[in-house]
Amino acid sequence: MNVLIINAGSSSLKYQLMNPETGDVAAKGLCERIYIDGRLTHKVGDKKVVKDIPMPTHSEAISAVLDILVDPVEGVIKSVDEIDAVGHRVLHGGMEFSDSCIINDEVIKAIEKCIPLGPLHNPANLMGIRACQAVMPNTPQVAVFDTAFHMTMPPKAYRYAIPKEYYENDDIRRYGFHGTSHKYVAKRTAELVGKKEFKMVNCHLGNGSSLSAIKDGKCMDTSMGLSPLAGVPMGTRSGDIDACVVQFICNKYNMSVDDCLTMLNKKSGMLALSGVSSDFRDLGEGAEKGNEDCVLALEKFSYEVAKYVGAYAAALNGIDVLTFTAGVGENDGLVRAMVCDYLGFMGVKLDPELNKCRGKEMVISTPDSKVQVWVVPTNEELMIAQDTAELVNAAKK
């Protein structure tokens, strides 16, 4: 089975053609500068092709993707008919969606309804969906929501302590993000430890970071909130702050709320603390050279991640497994060690040699650690492909 995975941005579109059963990627690439001029970067194995192709809209971008997939020289399939389904990443499903679903007119209307909750991403995701429908009208399309995995949270975790009408009228609550990644890691960890019923905290640590408290494969709590700004500090996001900080800055510097939120999203986090970079590799190098601001950034990040792990361990009444995933979680042994240094009270013990691993699926705790600590590389595209295949195959029965 071939599933085409689409992640549409406002002026870009990422794609992969994948076998959901094996995880093999036949081809992948990126369309960028949509609406401006258009450029396609297409990869098959180690071979990369870059083409300038006019892309006035997302429809032309999708057409360019399909053309190169069936190209006699650069392609990997003979006909578009060999694509069995399309899986779309959709950022915000609001309270409308608790799982992936086959796209129809009602689903599109519901995604449109969620635009106020995901004003930057949902319109772009819809453009990708409509573009695929236009050029592949007979191919099943599936929406996979970044928020869906977290919809199993209980009210005590997702409700904000603000007047009830804002929840009832405007759906203001904790939603959480990176759900497809958390779902994949939870599923894969269950396979690795050989059981379905256990308690874990997954640390998705990258330029954007979030944690999820998971019991028996279901999310009980997560660190991001109504938006991806909440939780631990990130590459350029502040993470949790006192809401009055916004009022103070806006009043003192005559700044609009929108401009203040842009600052909190794009000019804060590790970039602001270090004054150097949002890239954790740069922070590590700076810390080694004695840059105190880089040291502080790493200490702040590790401290906040550990605080969330401890809080979620309390919420779950203990945990069996702690997992690290995404760019920093998979590759940065220093950050993992700094986080776990705080967790000795839980019986967490890292093996220093095993913790040197980068991007490999493996246990990094000692045999006598009371909590198993794993590195589990995420694969959101595979999760999207598997969800898509499962829904499409079920619909055929």
What do these predicted regions represent?
Residues 3, 12-56, 225:
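Short glycine-rich, Thr/Ser-proximal phosphate-binding strand/loop in the N-terminal lobe
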Residues 68-83, 189-194, 309-320:
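Phosphate/pyrophosphate-binding loops at sites that engage ATP/ADP/AMP, CoA/4′-phosphopantetheine
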Residues 8-9, 89-91, 205-207, 323-331:
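Glycine-rich beta-strand-to-loop/alpha-helix junction loops that act as flexible
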Residues 262, 269-273, 280-315:
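Adenine-nucleotide phosphate-binding core of ATP-dependent small-molecule kinases
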Residues 295, 299-317, 329-397:
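Internal helix-turn-beta structural module
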Residues 215, 220-256, 262, 326-357:
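Catalytic phosphate/nucleotide-handling subdomain of diverse soluble enzymes
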Residues 149-252:
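Glycine-rich phosphate-binding loop of actin/hexokinase-like ATP-binding domains
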